[in-house]
Amino acid sequence: MIRFTPGNRIELLRSGGEFFPALEAAIDAAESEIWLETYIFADDSAGCVIAAALVRAAERGVDVRVLVDGWGAKHYLTKRLEHALRAGGVRLLKYRPEVAPWQFRFQRLRRLHRKICHVDQRVAFVGGINLIDDMNTPHQKPPRLDFAVRVTGPVLAPIVATMQRLWALVELVQFERSDVPLFPEPIAVAPSGTQTAKFVIRDNLRYRRDIERAYLAAIRTAKREIVIANAYFLPGLRFRHALIAAAERGVSVTLLLQARVEYRLLHYASRALYGQLLSAGVVIAEYHRSFLHAKVAVIDDRWATVGSSNIDPYSLLMAREANIFVRDPHFADQLRIELLQMIDTGTQHVEPERWAERSTLTKVVTWIAYGVVRVGMGVLGYGGHEWFPRRRARER
């Protein structure tokens, strides 16, 4: 199990308005190296600002490396922006750039969904924010709401090693000569604060369930309050049982979920689970004010997480994800205040009585969606009985 490390400084960044200036400032201060991983690198106002900063760094001799997901690159990284980065001296790789629709393979679903950057092995950024403007929300009401953290201290060591290892792996499978070891030596980073934290990833080899396990460990020991904000929420059986058990032992459990429909199938499949959760006393607040993209949580005013991982089959079973977990009352309180304000000002609560009275057609649609997702995951070989059990208690 990955241990918490003391001596860190973790700064909460709220959406692009705080994240992009902090990231640009760190890039502009870089002296030796910049490593960046992202799912989306858009050719828009925000993406171009960061791209220009990366090129400036490369032009002054900084080793700049960008790893972008192949699907994200296909849909957002324009040829113009890609050319500008490469021509400016940025070393750019694409993770799984398979895009041919007639060559379907299960592995194509294993995307690079994490959003990480480290500069000079002294400061890092981890979170759920892609390199895309908050106001650039196709088919959704802007702005996009999300979180990231700026990190200094010993927890940088696994961040650096993780990024080096994946870069070397991508070069290896793409038959490129790599100057990065596949198994890098750990670095030593001096303490810079008083906060205890750990960096946790999900991959398809050694760390398949680590993010989920970190969540479950905190939920199962919660004593007072659990607040989870997640844009795409379709948890497996163990996760649901942990939330229900917490609510039944008197813990206040609140889920802040996206109300607006982005992916219809996942949206309605998620709602098929509402009845079971509501019956146990879990509070569900759907965010209507704008586009919720957050993947964060606070438990008992002392534990918090910020990262890229949703609580759904894609994030917990297939994609490469990364979260920071923090044990610190001050940080947890900061994030909790943000979430409670979002709940107070931008949500509608799902009332158990009204939910039970929804139309038969609505019930059928949600369960068909859930069934389609279940069958699809089974065909792909993911999930098994733990995620979609064949027999379960009746869920209303």
Where are the predicted features?
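Charged, low-complexity intrinsically disordered terminal segments
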Residues: M1-R396
